[in-house]
Each structure stands twice: as structure tokens, then as C-alpha cells.
Design a protein with these regions (language model features):
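Short, glycine/acidic-enriched loop or turn micro-motifs at the edges of active sites
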Residues: 10-12, 178-181, 207, 272
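N-terminal hydrophobic targeting/anchoring segments and the immediately downstream early-domain regions
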Residues: 1-156, 161-162, 169, 212-229, ...
Length: 289
């Protein structure tokens, strides 16, 4: 029996926002094109609003939120909102359920944005997309909120604490997939110390015990997420699985299942790779994935 698949992370929105002549229906352009998702049995997909740390990040995030809404309006035969009604009628529809997320809070607030502007940006994004699957404070690098996964010695900053305060009670999980270890520790400590009702997950991360990479979760953080009833999305990128062994994907899935079989998921992280600058990273994905 083929079970419906829900995937916790793809970068279709940033692809549509930044790549000329981007087409979500062209399987030759991106691995999360709609035909690929349908062929793979994906019935529900989280679509990240991804931005890097740039002065124009807030504008780019708003553009991607508009694209998310436009997909729903222009292609109702293909996509619908991933909500309770969709899940209830999953077996009777051919549509793909979609929900947005925010990958890097630089899209909520750039380095020079005032807090009035940050709150307004967050509220506007949430109003546009309707709901958010999760928010990550950082990506690879540092921003005003904290340290990304490739930073050293940078944890949760004061602005990060203030943003967590604003998220409290909104039922939007915080994502640890792109945090430094120090930032992950800071987020968890701050949530506990101030009794903030914020769920925690890792949308597209693997396990450092299987493959030693800074983008992967330590056992400590993986177990902490499970302890908080969060979920772990296994990432399909070769760099985070194993440089040589495609079957390592299965090891990450099995390892996560042993932590909690109800808490493991896919977080494939399919993005536009045709302009990826580092030749050592190719192939980005094993054919197995």
C-alpha cells in the first residue's frame, strides 16, 4: 500500500521569485516541481519563504508570500491549503496541500528594520499565507537574531529573544535546522526559562551521530525535540547524508525512527541547483533520493 507523503521543506517559492522563467510544472528545472511531487506520492508540502541576510530580504519574503497565494489562486486543480479540511478529505482529492514556512527571520527583519516594521512584516506575512508551519531564526550565517549553522560562538541574541516573545502563543513552531549549537541551546533555554508556549522541531536536518556535519543535529538536540513532541525531517542533500554512500539516507531514517517512530518525517530540501557555485557539492542529491 502506498501511503501519502508529507514533506517538511522545499524551496519552490524562492525559485519562483528569483529564477527567470521559473516554472513550477517543469520537472527539468527543480526537483520539487509539481509533476515530481505527484509522481513521488507527496500529498502535502511545506514551502519555505527563504531569504539570505541582505537589505532587501524583507521585500523578497513578501514577494514569496505573494507567490504562495498566487499558486493557490491560479492552480486550484493542483494545490490547496494544507489545513484540517484538506487532511479530512485527503483520500477524495487529487490536490497537493501546501503550507508556508519562514526559513531565516531576516525576511521578517533586516539589520536596520525597526521593531514596529518587524512586527508589521511578520503580521503581514502571516495574514497573506494564512498559517505558518514553522519559523527558523537563521540560515547558514549570522543575523540580528542569532548565529546560523556555520557560525561559531554566536547564540541567541537579544533581538532573537524578543522575536521568541512575539511568537509565544501563536502556535507556530521554531525550527532548529539552521541554528548553531549555541543558538539551539539558547532557544531551548529561553523557552523553558520564560515558560513560552512555542513548539520546537527540525524541519530538514539529519543526525550528527551518523554523519558528522554542522548542519546535522546532535543527539542532545534531537532528543530534546522529541521530548517536546516535535518532529524531525530527514534531509536528502548528499552533503548532509554521506559524501559517498547513498544508502546512508536509510540509516538516518532508521536512527530517527528509533528515537521516536512517530516523530520522524521527510524534509527533502529540494531547491534550484542549476546555478550552484561549488562543484564539489555536485551531485547535490544521490539518484536514490
Amino acid at each position: 500500500m502506498n501511503l501519502p507523503i508529507a514533506d517538511l521543506h522545499c524551496d519552490l517559492l524562492s525559485f519562483l521569485a528569483k529564477v527567470p522563467k521559473a516554472d513550477p510544472f517543469d520537472p527539468d528545472q527543480i526537483a520539487c516541481a509539481f509533476p515530481w511531487l505527484k509522481a513521488g506520492g507527496v500529498r502535502a508540502q511545506v514551502m519555505a519563504i527563504y531569504t539570505d541576510v541582505h537589505p532587501e530580504s524583507m521585500e523578497l519574503a513578501s514577494q514569496q508570500a505573494d507567490i504562495f497565494v498566487q499558486l493557490l489562486e491560479d492552480h486550484p486543480e493542483t494545490v490547496c491549503r494544507w489545513d484540517g479540511a484538506f487532511q479530512q478529505h485527503l483520500e477524495s482529492t487529487e490536490q497537493l496541500g501546501i503550507i508556508a514556512s519562514i526559513e531565516n527571520a531576516a525576511g521578517i527583519g533586516t539589520a536596520t528594520a525597526t521593531w514596529k516594521e518587524i512586527y508589521a512584516q511578520f503580521d503581514a506575512l502571516l495574514e497573506k499565507v494564512g498559517s505558518l508551519a514553522y519559523i527558523s531564526l537563521t540560515h547558514h550565517t549570522e543575523n540580528r537574531f542569532g548565529g546560523g549553522n556555520y557560525t561559531e560562538g554566536i547564540g541567541l541574541k537579544e533581538d532573537g529573544k524578543r522575536l521568541l516573545d512575539y511568537l509565544a502563543g501563536k502556535r507556530i513552531p521554531i525550527d532548529l535546522s539552521h541554528t548553531s549549537d549555541l543558538l539551539a541551546e539558547g532557544i531551548l533555554t529561553y523557552i523553558d526559562r520564560h515558560h513560552l508556549p512555542i513548539p520546537v522541531l527540525a524541519s530538514h536536518s539529519n543526525f550528527r551521530s551518523i554523519w558528522n556535519h554542522k548542519r546535522n543535529l546532535t543527539d542532545e538536540f534531537a532528543q530534546e525535540i522529541i521530548h517536546r513532541n516535535g518532529i524531525l525531517g530527514v534531509n536528502f542533500l548528499r552533503a548532509f547524508l554521506d559524501n559517498e554512500q547513498p544508502e546512508r539516507l536509510f540509516e538516518h531514517l532508521i536512527y530517527g525512527s528509533k528515537l521516536n517512530e512517530q516523530g520522524i518525517a521527510f524534509g527533502a530540501d529540494f531547491f534550484y541547483t542549476q546555478d550552484f557555485p561549488d562543484p564539489s557539492r555536485h551531485p547535490i542529491y544521490f539518484p536514490l533520493a
